[in-house]
Amino acid sequence: MFPELNNLLSITPDRTEQGKLTLLCDAKTDGSFLVHHFLSFYLKANCKVCFVALVQSFSHYNIVGQKLGVSLTAARERGQLVFLEGLKSSVEVLFHSQEEPHPLQFLREAGAGNLQSLYTFIQDTLKPADSGESPWKCPVLLVDNLSVLLSLGVGAVAVLDFMQYCRATVCCELKGNVVALVHDTEGAEDEENNILLNGLSHQSHLILRTQGLATGFCKDVHGQLSILWRRSSQPTAQRARSLTYQYKIQDKNVSFFAKGMSRAVL
């Protein structure tokens, strides 16, 4: 995890909020560093994590995780991390017969709109065991990323319904958290992605949006991060609070600074 980002969000592994939906979105840049941050953050916070990874392999996340001080292999072996590797699983679903329903069963079904099997997998993974108390603090669902489901033929409404069920189960029933990444097509004529992004934005408690610099590439400033807190329980004037920073990605860290305050500029 990145300590500077924790400071901006006012969170620590020792003090994690529960019942929250966090939306990560990236526009014309790669926002995957946010996924790695929250994955390592919740593992260090001793949370039970179900990671639906539709973009990269387990080894990729594990290598980055080791740089951030966590071992995904060890977390998976002790039962703290349940990792659904979409790249590998999709091959199994498409080219091998399955005796039991697979979380990605929708890939073999006409219309590819039913995410019931994926929801059931998440529900069974995160629900507490019947015997004794759970050794983990709270359950967390992490998805990287939902836009891939649209590319696989699932409609935006179906994805929103799926996320609504996940939020009701993980956030409300189990008092856990959900974190999901969605690409922001930013003005492109992608109606389905816009529906998905807008729908999730209204449901989210926290939105982190990364975007490239309007001036183009800069070796000392890699992009801009906007943080929006949404508090539906507060009066209208206090419901939303936002901050914007620029950032530079390093090998094992990400540094954040106010606009125009990069060391290269100063």
Swiss-Prot record:
Q: In which pathway does it act?
A: tRNA modification; 5-methoxycarbonylmethyl-2-thiouridine-tRNA biosynthesis
Q: Which UniProt keywords apply?
A: Cytoplasm, Nucleus, tRNA processing
- Superkingdom field: Eukaryota
Q: Where are the transmembrane segments?
A: none
Q: Main localization of the protein?
A: cytoplasm
Listed GO biological process terms: apoptotic process; autophagosome maturation; autophagy; cellular response to stress; homeostasis of number of retina cells; inflammasome-mediated signaling pathway; locomotory behavior; motor behavior
Q: Which GO terms describe its cellular component?
A: cytosol; elongator holoenzyme complex; nucleus
Q: What does this protein do?
A: Component of the elongator complex which is required for multiple tRNA modifications, including mcm5U (5-methoxycarbonylmethyl uridine), mcm5s2U (5-methoxycarbonylmethyl-2-thiouridine), and ncm5U (5-carbamoylmethyl uridine). The elongator complex catalyzes formation of carboxymethyluridine in the wobble base at position 34 in tRNAs. Involved in cell migration.
User: What family, per the record?
Assistant: Belongs to the ELP6 family.
Q: What is this protein called?
A: Elongator complex protein 6
Lineage of origin: Eukaryota, Metazoa, Chordata, Craniata, Vertebrata
